[in-house]
Amino acid sequence: MRTLVVGAAIVDLMMKVERLPKSGEDIPCKETKTVVGGCAYNVANTLRNLKCEHDLCVPVGSGSFADIIRRGMKEKGYEPMIEEPGEDNGYCLSLVEADGERTFITVQGAECHFKKEWFNRIDMDRYENIYIAGYQVCGKSGEIISQWLKTVPNVEEKHIFLHRDR
């Protein structure tokens, strides 16, 4: 049973800090780490580790963050299904406090601007399962994904998993 994982790949910029700064305050960062993340990317990697057949359908733009994502995908054996040259991918600044509490600041990019024509390239007969990351079903992208699902042949026979982020 093959799964199509639809959603986002973004760059996570993680910074370990003792505590969050007060407004206007400057504090030192103990450690930084840059990794590829995003719900769909993380789910695909879990499926990969479990040896489940799947494809990762995330838009990869053009720019410095898209380049990091493209390299991360290649390292995991993924080829971009969607190339969006007009926009860079987004990133998330994660502030991790000493007690482990995490605070996020997200800059959206190509992964939040789904286009109807992206789905025209996908042979849905290959998939029994469809996983959709919830962050992508918000706003206009959600409308586009919902409209696409209505056009999927035999959609009622497929297992659809929707992950709600918030």
Please provide the spans of the model-predicted regions.
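Ribokinase/PfkB-type carbohydrate-kinase core domain
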Residues: M1-A9, P59, R70-E83, E97-R166
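Glycine-rich phosphate/adenosyl-contacting loop at the front of the ribokinase-like
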Residues: M1-P59, A66-I68
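Residue-level recognition of alpha-helix initiation/capping sites
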Residues: G38, S64, K140-E143
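A generic structural signal for short, solvent-exposed coil/turn residues
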Residues: R48, P85-E87, E97
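Short, basic and Ser/Thr-rich N-terminal targeting/leader segments
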Residues: L50, K76, E87-N89
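Short alpha-helical
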Residues: G63-S64, D88
